[in-house]
Amino acid sequence: MELRPYQWEVILPALEGKNIIIWLPTGAGKTRAAAFVAKRHLETVDRGKVVVLVNRVHLVSQHAEEFRRMLDKHWTVTTLSGDMGSRAGFGLMARSHDLLICTAELLQLALNSSEEDEHVELREFSLIVVDECHHTHKDTVYNTILSRYLEQKLKKAEPLPQVLGLTASPGTGGATKLQGAIDHILQLCANLDTCHIMSPKNCYSQLLMHNPKPCKQYDLCQRRAQDPFGDLIKKLMNQIHQQLEMPDLKQQFGTQMYEQQVVQLCKDAAEAGLQEQRVYALHLRRYNDALFIHDTVRARDALDMLQDFYDRERTTKTQMVRAESWLLKLFDDHKNVLGQLAARGPENPKLEMLERILLKQFGSPGHTRGIIFTRTRQTASSLLLWLRQQPCLQTVGIKPQMLIGAGNTSQSTHMTQKDQQEVIQEFRDGILSLLVATSVAEEGLDIAQCNVVVRYGLLTNEISMVQARGRARAGQSVYSFLATEGSREMKRELTNEALEVLMEKAVAAVQKMDPDEFKAKIRDLQQASLVKRAARAAHREIQQGQFLPEHVQLLCINCMVAVGYGSDLRKVEGTHHVNVNPNFSVYYTTSQNPVVINKVFKDWRPGGTIRCSNCGEVWGFQMIYKSVTLPVLKIGSILLETPRGKIQAKKWSRVPFSIPVFDILQDCTQSLSELSLD
């Protein structure tokens, strides 16, 4: 499989064993170029071993196809991802294959594992390929892995693998001035330990010929001239504000700023023990969500979301404070009027504009395939329903489906990773002609026939803009940005265009740097990064040592009943936090049906949802780990009562006490008879 001249140009330093970043536009063949580097590496390096890291599960199989096409049959290739379930250990798989394609999270777990079959060291690989390497920053999994690499490099302890980064959009890191953008690019190079960021120079004209940009159009609409449904929602929010008796609370309903305000109010109220204030804040957030949905899709979709929320409140809450009863009555008193307004209210101008775009594109001769990008799973689900209910869209042969993340929350729909793969394949095969997608499809998704991309009212950064645009792969493709005239989304898209130009200037400036100056700068940045990481680790250690675990009580976030102590908690696989006290079971009830988690795990499977037996608040779910059933707690459902007051932590990693790793023998032997066995 031959490379194009511009691909040859960008991989030359990598063929010499140097660490580089390949910067090519989406659709220009970064993966094929990387596969060729891997092939040459295995052919020339004694006992070479390659690992390809991706940040999305669906990219594992997509990349495997590309690498297998490039490699000779005698090179063994395997894939590992979070949806594989029971499998051999990561270490065993790595040691028995020449090339491994996996999600970065699995490599990180293997690096930290103490099990011989699972554990692996970076030195066991001779080449690391980092797909979408612009994510190598801050505390991402990519950067955690590469920080380990840098620590070993600066210690000069052992030979290290070659690094090859791939990106279409290094970004500006939030910078709006050239020097800030240059600093961001240099930091990315330092994090990946690269000596060059490579893009075509001599073969640039050939790149443009093979990879033309889609035609961009701004499709702008006006706001609803009248909005009785939205006005009534805001009136109800005003009534809740009156109950709160907080005149300083800003009433910028339907904005992200307002959402942040009520989220903070909810946290502050929980820590102050103000149950009713917390409940009002929670419900205000739901009404604000309804305004978001109403602005994006239809009033009936917003009302359906509110109805689902209040139905769940009724069926799950076994104990209610006065505020909850008042809020339920408020909704009940107005839901019929809201229903009438939703049924006869004006159509959303954004949907009318979207219909015109789709009719024009899909009504043209030829085979059209498109992707609509939207902000949330909820709006993706609502858009799909709307698409299926428009007779005129059916007449032009639109066959839509959703492509969303594999999460699981009570507030939104979700897809299994198997579902994702099937949808992507059906889109490739032409069984489906239109995807309604969240950001899960922005990066790496390679469908050559896709010729229409619509960004539907999105407020994102320049990287997301470049990535979404790059899904339009076919010739004469159209990239539509659909938003309300004068909206924040429109202003942000214009800013993104300016930032894309700034990014290109910053990369060019870094490429022109004197090699010695570049090396010195990278070395300084790497040393500074490790110092900062060590300082953060020391800070975390101090933070986690503030209190003894047995001095911290665990309270239900809703009813504030004490249900355990910090000393009851253990960590499983680094991310799940379980309560190992056998007496804890008296404080919760369990649903009969297991929760849906859209992965199959190696050592455990999910059980039922667990709820506070006093008030019905959802705390988490059961984990059946190596036949032992353990309750997993969500940090958002637990309030911590410390010797200095109540705390609602955002993450378990930020609680003010240490949580040891779960040891099945030590933690379960004494009370095994009392624990539930599968």
Swiss-Prot record:
Gene3D superfamilies: 1.20.1320.30, P-loop containing nucleotide triphosphate hydrolases, RIG-I-like receptor, C-terminal regulatory domain. Disruption phenotype: Embryonic lethality at a high frequency. Adult female that survive show an enlarged uterus filled with fluid resulting from vaginal atresia. SUPFAM superfamilies: P-loop containing nucleoside triphosphate hydrolases (SSF52540). Residues 572-655 are annotated as: RNA-binding. GO terms for cellular component: cytoplasm. Its main location: cytoplasm. It catalyses: ATP + H2O = ADP + phosphate + H(+). Pfam families: Helicase_C, ResIII, RIG-I_C, RIG-I_C-RD. Residues 542-669 form the RLR CTR domain. Induction: By interferon (IFN), virus infection, or intracellular dsRNA. InterPro entries: Helicase/UvrB_N, Helicase_ATP-bd, Helicase_C-like, P-loop_NTPase, RIG-I-like_C, RLR_C_sf, RLR_CTR, RLR_Helicase. This is ATP-dependent RNA helicase DHX58. It comes from Mus musculus (Mouse). The lineage of its organism: Eukaryota, Metazoa, Chordata, Craniata, Vertebrata. The gene is Dhx58.
